[in-house]
Curated annotation (Swiss-Prot):
EC category name: isomerase
Disulfide bridge partners, by residue number: none
Catalytic activity: L-glutamate = D-glutamate
Taxon lineage: Bacteria, Pseudomonadati, Pseudomonadota, Gammaproteobacteria, Enterobacterales
Protein name (record): Glutamate racemase
Family: Belongs to the aspartate/glutamate racemases family.
GO annotation terms (biological process): cell wall organization; peptidoglycan biosynthetic process; regulation of cell shape
Taxonomic source organism: Klebsiella pneumoniae (strain 342)
Residues bound to substrate: D28, S29, Y60, G61, N93, T94, T205, H206
Keyword Cell wall biogenesis/degradation: yes
HAMAP family cross-referenced by the UniProt entry: Glu_racemase (MF_00258)
Length: 283
């Protein structure tokens, strides 16, 4: 079935008939959450997936906590009204650090968040120096400091906050090349260190999309760690043990908050990830 672009009031193409499958929402401010979705899909290929991204308010890294909580609850509510959910994954580090309590209070289905993979990084580092690459919001939030104090208090944590990397990842998915000189400029504080981090936590779901380029710029042998595989395992456990029986036989679907020329450019990418249609989600 060809990928098509639809607004919220346009009837969808007929869904491909299939057995009912648990419906799982994966949400991000942008398309970085596709990296988490891909890990979940590899482990759990036979689910009904909804991918929603907030291209109107993107990026979240510089937004206030109050705005993020209200916005994420509003979007998840709108999806739940259309498709009863078995589980939701907030595939955005920034949103996860502030919105999970409100979401878990409002909804009966499990809500999985994404947090920086500091704990495994602290176990893997050989030189005791761990880099945290995240948005500026994630770097500044108390939740991140709590993770470090709890799981990596014997390591030296070098934090680097960047909104530009998010933009570069989005541009890459739109087909634009990633300028390595720009990456070197962003990572310069680490590249100038006499002993740089040997293990780097990708603390934003956009950043695994830049893994190849990051490995070309960082010192040889630097480990890059993200939480995608752990989120997939957690999703599988919750679906088996705690999720409600919310199923659909519809095809996978992607939602954005506004249809634009940029979202139209994403159609081939979404199709490759298994989303044949993209709609505007009415809020």
């Amino acid at each position: 079935m060809a990928t098509n672009l639809q607004d919220g009031n346009t009837p969808c193409l007929a869904a491909t008939p299939s057995d009912p499958r648990p419906t799982v929402l994966v949400f991000d401010s942008g398309v970085g959450g596709l990296s988490v979705y891909n890990e979940i899909r590899q482990l759990l290929p036979n689910l009904h997936y909804i991918y929603a991204f907030d291209n109107v308010a993107f990026p979240y890294g510089e937004k206030s906590e109050e705005f993020i909580v209200e916005r994420v609850v509003e979007i998840v509510t709108a999806v739940q009204q259309r498709y009863p959910l078995a589980l939701a994954v907030i595939a955005c580090n920034t949103a996860s650090t502030v919105s999970l309590p409100a979401l878990r209070e409002k909804f009966a289905f499990p809500v999985v968040g994404v947090v920086p993979a500091i704990k495994p990084a602290a176990r893997l580092t050989a030189n005791g120096i761990v880099g945290l690459l995240a948005t500026r919001g994630t770097v500044k939030r108390p939740y991140t400091r709590e993770l470090i104090d709890r799981f990596a208090n014997e390591c030296r944590i070098e934090m680097l906050g960047s909104a530009e990397l998010v933009e570069l990842a989005e541009a890459k998915l739109h087909g634009e090349p990633v300028p390595l000189e720009e990456l070197r400029r962003i990572l310069r504080p680490w590249l100038r260190m006499q002993e740089p981090p040997d293990t780097v936590v990708l603390g934003c779901t956009h950043f695994p999309l830049l893994q190849e380029e990051l490995q070309r710029v960082l010192p040889e042998g630097t480990r890059l760690i993200d939480s995608g595989a752990a989120i997939a395992r957690r999703t599988a456990w919750l679906l088996e043990h705690e999720a409600p029986d919310a199923k659909s036989s519809d095809e996978n679907k992607a939602f954005c908050m506004a249809l634009t020329a940029e979202t139209e450019q994403l159609l081939p990418v979404l199709h490759r990830y298994g989303f044949p249609t993209l709609e505007k989600l009415p809020l």
